[in-house]
């Protein structure tokens, strides 16, 4: 098990330091969410929830466009993007701004409960590159236990509607990914899930549960920290809250460790400051010198996924 995980991350070059600028940037355009999911710490998040101001958002996007327009940019961090589908600015304007600046890999993550046909149209019009939809069950009974407050049939209809609309408009974007976080409650549904959604034309993403840096239980994290290797998220990802704080990694929902703020500094400056020091500790195996949150975390072994599709990926 250990060698399989480690070898896969090495093969995907996920353990390399990204260098002077991150390969992945998470932008917390909105930190509010409409569900209470069992695999997510969001419902217990203590920091104030909000919406990123437009001037801060554009500052971030403008720098990415100059430094690395091919970086993967997640236009949502801890919330659901369609909470701001009717605000000013809204998520569609934010997508369009990023694409107009030349970004090549603008993506969203959503539970899809707030989607509808209009949302699908606007995502395609804005030029979104990919959308990842959290749908961790093949049966409605399992779904409602895991994604509390969600409507399974509505989500399935929304995903199928987006796939159908892409065909009608002969659009190859956005890539539609359905994500399944494997847990005891749903693991027997994986095969049916993979078969059904692959046949519908979606790309299936199967991934392990994370503990959000020790905040919830993730019993399938069976490797001990004495066997650890550098964390993929630490090596390649810059995570920015709606206030501009740069936190330790995507698992730091409560902003327990703040490396800097991109209102006061550039992304590049923050990336090459405290975060670079932490990356060096990872690369040299000095894990005992990391901040406590990172030192005790076991999510380094969960930074991986398997993908399935009937079409070449």
Which residue ranges define each predicted feature?
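Short, charged low-complexity intrinsically disordered segments located at boundaries
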Residues: 94-98, 186-196, 225-226, 294-311
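Short, small/polar residue-rich loop motifs at catalytic or cofactor-binding pockets
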Residues: 232-234
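Conserved glycine-rich "GG(E/T)P / GGGxP" loop and the immediately following alpha-helix
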Residues: 19-215
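Short, acidic, Ser/Thr-enriched surface-loop or helix-capping motifs
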Residues: 240-243
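Short, surface-exposed beta-strand/loop micro-motifs that present aromatic residues
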Residues: 236-238
């Amino acid at each position: 098990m250990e060698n399989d995980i480690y070898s896969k991350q090495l093969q995907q070059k996920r353990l390399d330091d990204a260098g002077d600028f991150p390969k992945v940037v998470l932008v917390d355009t909105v930190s509010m969410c409409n569900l209470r999911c069992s695999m997510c710490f969001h419902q217990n998040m203590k920091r104030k929830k909000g919406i990123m101001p437009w001037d801060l958002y554009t500052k971030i996007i403008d720098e990415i466009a100059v430094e690395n327009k091919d970086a993967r940019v997640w236009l949502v961090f801890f919330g659901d993007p369609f909470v701001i589908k009717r605000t000013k600015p809204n998520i569609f304007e934010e997508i369009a701004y990023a694409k107009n600046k030349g970004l090549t890999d603008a993506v969203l993550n959503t539970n899809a409960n707030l989607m509808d046909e209009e949302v699908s149209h606007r995502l395609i019009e804005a030029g979104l590159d990919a959308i990842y939809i959290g749908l961790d069950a093949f049966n409605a009974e399992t779904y409602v236990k895991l994604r509390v407050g969600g409507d399974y049939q509505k989500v399935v209809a929304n995903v199928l509607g987006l796939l159908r609309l892409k065909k009608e408009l002969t659009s190859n974007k956005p890539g539609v990914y359905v994500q399944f976080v494997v847990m005891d409650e749903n693991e027997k549904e994986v095969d049916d899930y993979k078969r059904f959604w692959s046949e519908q034309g979606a790309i299936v993403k199967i991934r392990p549960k994370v503990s959000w840096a020790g905040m919830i239980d993730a019993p399938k994290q069976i490797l001990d920290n004495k066997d650890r290797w550098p964390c993929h998220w630490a090596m390649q990802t810059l995570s920015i809250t709606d206030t501009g704080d740069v936190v330790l990694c995507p698992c730091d929902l409560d902003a327990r460790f703040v490396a800097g703020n991109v209102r006061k500094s550039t992304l590049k400056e923050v990336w090459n400051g405290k975060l670079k020091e932490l990356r060096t500790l990872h690369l040299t195996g000095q894990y005992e010198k990391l901040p406590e949150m990172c030192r005790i975390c076991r999510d380094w072994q969960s930074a991986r996924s398997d993908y399935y599709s009937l079409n070449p990926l």
